[in-house]
């Protein structure tokens, strides 16, 4: 009887492990959305004939630690009358409000502090939506380390 239970357990675990990757790595579809590697350095995106640069330190970017966010605007956006801000969240998941308020630090650069929380689902793909008042939004999608 003990041998039968062991064999059934082995069969069950083998079947689970062979089919689990699709279930365990549910955020694979979000991995394909990543457009930024903040661990390597600042990320740059074009926005309405302008450029938005996002930098997060310290690197590597880890959840549940105090992070320093820096946004630099170029082109017409460099004369934005109001400071941009960052909303942190996860693609496809409502994480509740997590806003990084940015303050001007000179030369069309804005800085602020924030924390990326650890998601109970285990997903590590995060999104920083930078809102430039009266101009629009741009998304930087990246991985964090837990």
Model segments located where?
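Bacterial N-terminal signal peptides that target proteins for export
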Residues: 1-9
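Bacterial N-terminal signal peptides
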Residues: 9-17
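Contiguous segments within soluble domain cores/interaction surfaces
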Residues: 22-125, 129-132, 138-146
């Amino acid at each position: 009887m003990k041998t039968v239970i062991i064999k059934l357990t082995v069969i069950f675990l083998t079947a689970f492990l062979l089919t689990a990757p699709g279930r365990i790595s549910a955020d694979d579809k979000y991995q394909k959305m990543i457009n930024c590697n903040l661990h390597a350095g600042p990320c740059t995106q074009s926005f309405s004939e302008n450029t938005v640069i996002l930098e997060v330190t310290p690197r590597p970017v880890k959840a549940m630690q105090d992070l320093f966010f820096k946004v630099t605007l170029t082109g017409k956006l460099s004369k934005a009358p109001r400071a941009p801000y960052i909303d942190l969240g996860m693609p496809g998941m409502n994480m509740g409000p997590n806003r990084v308020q940015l303050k001007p630090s000179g030369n069309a650069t804005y800085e602020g502090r924030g924390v990326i929380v650890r998601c109970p689902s285990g997903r590590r793909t995060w999104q920083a939506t930078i809102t430039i008042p009266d101009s629009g939004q741009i998304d930087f999608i990246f991985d964090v380390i837990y």
